Amino acid sequence: MKEYGNEIELIEFIVKSLVDKEDEVKLNVIEGEKSTILELRVSQSDVGKIIGRRGRIARAIRTLLGACAAKTNRRVQLEILD
């Protein structure tokens, strides 16, 4: 999990900047052999702010995450859970 410290900090910073209920932001890391899944949980009222119109904000966050994770040659996926 140390390998993903920067990615986790980046996602938490971005998400907490967008939501109203910062204390309900939870990020769970599930590590696989070649990929890692980051499960993001936010308040039900803040899910729309994270996804954005037509998924634009979620896509932008995933793009930043992919660029940050490219250094480790592993795939990192972001799942937004309600």
Swiss-Prot record:
GO molecular function per UniProt: RNA binding
Main location class: cytoplasm
Domain KH: 35-82
GO CC annotation: cytoplasm
Record keywords, A-Z: Cell shape, Cell wall biogenesis/degradation, Chaperone, Cytoplasm, RNA-binding
Protein name as catalogued: RNA-binding protein KhpA
Compartmental location: Cytoplasm
Family: Belongs to the KhpA RNA-binding protein family.
A GO biological-process term: regulation of cell shape
Job of this protein: A probable RNA chaperone. Forms a complex with KhpB which binds to cellular RNA and controls its expression. Plays a role in peptidoglycan (PG) homeostasis and cell length regulation.
Positions of transmembrane segments: none
Subunit structure of this chain's protein: Forms a complex with KhpB.
Source organism of this protein record: Borreliella burgdorferi (strain ATCC 35210 / DSM 4680 / CIP 102532 / B31)
Gene this protein is translated from: khpA
